[in-house]
């Protein structure tokens, strides 16, 4: 029996790993990012730790910080519009599984416009094109969404979770920076650690 194993193009690990961002971006010729995160990470300064690196390197970006816990179809749809309006050619996802899942949904619909919305990608998705490149910077150690080919979105109309599986949505680069995780409240860090176990 033959099995297939899909991984990111490259992963960086260690305290301060976010400082590799300018090199990662320049080496790939990417021009403008849509930063996908949530208001809590903006409020507590965790996202700022990444944005400061982008600012210091004069990297263009716009922020979509409306990610909700357990993101919904409408949440992803708003992100798709933000990405198109920003004319971003790559995505930087900062956060836990919700930010990663939202970024995947945004990225795959933007590059596969024949699909009306994320609902049409439930199950094993039939996309043909790779999603916009995603650089994933996890702030939790729970779902490993920065390295997987699946994402979970809530369909509000049916009131159920959709699992989407698509090799085209795996983040191109994972940057696992312990300093981002240190910055979270201890209770959240502990809870996501238990989730990983």
Residue ranges with predicted function:
Residues 42-115:
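N-terminal small/polar loop signature for handling phosphorylated ligands or for N-terminal nucleophile
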């Amino acid at each position: 029996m033959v099995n297939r194993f899909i991984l990111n193009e490259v992963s960086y690990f260690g305290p301060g790993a976010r400082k590799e961002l300018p090199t990662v971006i320049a080496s790939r010729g990417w021009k403008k990012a849509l930063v996908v995160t949530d208001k809590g990470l903006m409020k507590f300064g965790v996202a700022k730790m990444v944005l400061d690196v982008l600012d210091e390197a004069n990297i263009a970006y716009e922020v979509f910080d409306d990610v909700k816990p357990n993101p919904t179809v409408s949440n992803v749809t708003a992100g798709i519009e933000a990405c198109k309006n920003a004319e971003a050619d790559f995505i930087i996802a900062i956060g836990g599984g919700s930010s990663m899942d939202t970024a995947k949904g945004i990225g795959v619909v933007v590059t596969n416009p024949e699909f009306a919305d994320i609902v049409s990608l439930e199950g094993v998705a039939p996309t043909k094109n790779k999603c916009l490149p995603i650089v994933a910077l996890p702030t939790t150690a729970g779902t490993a969404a920065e390295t997987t080919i699946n994402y979970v979105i809530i369909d509000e109309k049916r009131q159920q979770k959709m699992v989407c599986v698509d090799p085209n949505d795996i983040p191109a680069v994972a940057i696992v920076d312990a300093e981002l995780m240190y910055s979270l409240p201890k209770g959240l860090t502990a809870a996501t650690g238990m989730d990983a176990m």
